Amino acid sequence: MTNEASLTPIPLPAEKLAQLQTVTNGLSTAQIAWISGYLWGRSSGADTTNQSLPTSPATEQPVEPTVITILSASQTGNARRIAEELRDDLLAAHLKVNLINTGDYKFKQIDREKIILMVTSTQGEGEPPEEAVAFYKFLFSKKAPKLTHTAFAVFGLGDITYEHFAQAGNDFDRRFEELGGERLLPRVDADVDYEEAAEAWRKEVTELLEKRVPSANSAQIAATAISPVDEVSSTPYDKESPLTATLSVNQKITGRHSDKDVRHIEIDLGDSGLHYKPGDALGVWYENDPALIRECLDLLGLSGEESIKVNDKILPLAQALQQSFELTVNNTRLVESYATLTQNKALEKIISDKAALQDYAQNTPIVDMIRQAGGKLTAEQFVSLLRPLTPRLYSIASSQAEVENEVHLTVGVVRYEIDGHKRAGGASSFLADRLAENGNLRVFVEHNDNFRLPDNPDAPVIMIGPGTGVAPFRAFMQQRDNDGAKGKNWLFFGNPHFIEDFLYQVEWQAYVKQGLLTHIDLAWSRDQAKKVYVQDKLREKAAEIWKWIKEDGAYLYVCGDATHMAKDVDKALIDIIRQEGGMDEEAADEFLTELRLERRYQRDVY
């Protein structure tokens, strides 16, 4: 800017300038960029209502800037948050960006992309998140085009406690390269404490693209600043700033002789204004069991009074372990590090065998590893092994149309024994055992736009949810009841025993009597010699299920275990489509994929 320009008076009276500052306070980089383009378009006489580009003077022949496509493939919202932050970074660098959920992406046109930046999580046994399944299948099919004119970079999220850590990111990265794409940067695989890695990757990507891609003007940025991606949340409460709520009900809903301990949890949100929809999850921040902490400290020869630094704060070790570190779930890196620090021969043998290491980490809690292997560590050494505490997510089991300022959960309490020592899950035992009624807990809503009731209240729905997977379908039924929805509803539920494990039995029976629940099919796996599961019940009703899908336009929903149940249900549905629709295996699989793309087959599996 020249000196003369810098001395030019601001062409706004103080009152108008104050109004402008008021309007723009608190806006994101993306929103400010859009407003900038909108106003520039107004000044040029362009039609800004459709975010069209202002007409350039005839003497100017600007080069059309490259559009950078960011694909967000998120399961719990973390990948989407990173993608949104990356979008804002690139917009601030005056680059043209299109951020889109992978589930909304027209992937058959992928070969037209110049730059793809993908942020993806991983679910189940190394599988892509639900919204990216159709895209994943397309990329790995014979239909996938060459990407010889496309550059890419991938940021993969995962959890090191699982064998196939960040596998989806690995797969996408490898496939982009196999199709001829140019890798801009090495793939990043990030664990649950991903924040620093994500920030570094975003910075590296932005700096690289600033040099590689011509910048766009404000109006061109505005044309892509508003893009078809669901923002994570507009609530003041989130993972980093949770709501302090109150536990109002903790009721066991399995029988006294059941092998399962399932709790119906009700949480009072007060007048917080926190809103959720059926299909969303509730994030619960928990604290570790003081007895577990004491056991770890005693085994390591520590008092708990030692001072350690956590996020720039100095805390007593025992307090830090209770509030800030994961103590219940082991992982392979921790086992390897503990073996190195203690030089324990048995652990050293285990870590030399990848399969043995994975099995040991998955089946041996941290405290039992310490007990079995022995060894003394300093406070700093111990916490250096541990991952930060992360919230647990639970499918919400209520509709606010029914329960208003409450949120309900269906929590399966994890309990087991190791060498005669009783162990329990960190979050589930916190809710079931350690949090008193009327006690406070920190919560937030994790929105899941990939698990929603159909917009049309007359559309039929088929709900498949064994065990605690039935939770969101309780919310679905409450919502449809309050909406006066006329669509048919069909529930498939399963558990070991009818007498002990029929969760919410009275409610389902009332919905049947009312006529809201058209059908309910029940699978009790241990009430007879031959085990019966929900997938068996699906096959028994193949003809009617096919009629609901093909003729009535039914929506299918699956919730629960990703490792076994969800795959078995997938296989059963493909068998039904193949058998009743007269298709071969490949055509049936494609039919199910089309249902996904139409949002008529949705899964919430974990």
Curated annotation (Swiss-Prot):
Q: How does it assemble?
A: Alpha(8)-beta(8). The alpha component is a flavoprotein, the beta component is a hemoprotein.
Q: List the disulfide bonds.
A: none
Look up the record and name the cofactor or cofactors this protein needs.
FAD; FMN
Q: Where does FMN bind?
A: 74-79, 121-124, 157-166
What is this protein's function?
Answer: Component of the sulfite reductase complex that catalyzes the 6-electron reduction of sulfite to sulfide. This is one of several activities required for the biosynthesis of L-cysteine from sulfate. The flavoprotein component catalyzes the electron flow from NADPH -> FAD -> FMN to the hemoprotein component.
Please name the GO terms of the biological process aspect recorded for this protein, alphabetically: cysteine biosynthetic process; hydrogen sulfide biosynthetic process; sulfate assimilation
Every FAD-binding FR-type domain range: 240-454
Organism, scientific name: Zymomonas mobilis subsp. mobilis (strain ATCC 31821 / ZM4 / CP4)
The UniProt record gives the binding positions of NADP(+) as S525, R526, K531, V532, Y533, V534, Q535, D568
**Which key words tag this protein in UniProt?**
Amino-acid biosynthesis, Cysteine biosynthesis, Electron transport, FAD, Flavoprotein, FMN, NADP, Oxidoreductase, Transport
Name-wise, this protein is Sulfite reductase [NADPH] flavoprotein alpha-component
InterPro entries, alphabetized: CysJ, CysJ-like_FAD-binding, CysJ_Proteobact, FAD-bd_FR_type, Flavdoxin-like, Flavodoxin/NO_synth, Flavoprot_Pyr_Nucl_cyt_Rdtase, Flavoprotein-like_sf
Query: What pathway is it annotated to?
Result: Sulfur metabolism; hydrogen sulfide biosynthesis; hydrogen sulfide from sulfite (NADPH route): step 1/1
- Supply one GO CC term from the record: cytosol
Q: Could you give a GO molecular-function term held by this entry?
A: flavin adenine dinucleotide binding
Residues that coordinate or bind FAD = 328, 362, 392-395, 410-412, 416, 425-428, 606
